[in-house]
Amino acid sequence: MSKENSGEERALSKNCMDIGFFTRHIDKALEFWREELGLPFEEPVKFNGGLTQYRHALGDSVIKINTSDRDIGSSPCGYQELYIADDNTEAPVSTTDPDGNIVTRVPTGHLGIQGLGIKVASPNLETQRHFYTNVMGFKDLGSHKFAAGNTILLVEQNNK
């Protein structure tokens, strides 16, 4: 049984999304996000079980880089690309972080992105649309693009 969002309430606690991922290359990852991309950061947060989170600000969003003292294995995620809007960027410029994630700086407003954009792969576009709009309450912008507050989600077909 699913609970659908009435549209009156948002599934977000703030007007944007955060994104997080695990890394096995924390020193290289921190250098990438702090030095190469220049994102401001906070002191790391330690959790039970040997988990540590490094938080980097991206407007109102937070990039959460997580590490573990234990083997975390590898499991695929649906994130395909992270977009960062930048007033000083004239055309999209892609790079890859130390974990192989594609990170693209885009001009502010490119694809409707004002801060954070996330490209997501889904095996079923209609199911993903239903989940984002009817369950999460995100705004359908057409062409498989959704607004989660001021975060833009771009969904593409994944036939794997």
Q: Model-derived features: where do they sit?
A:
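Glyoxalase I/VOC metalloenzyme domain signal
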Residues: 1-43, 54-160
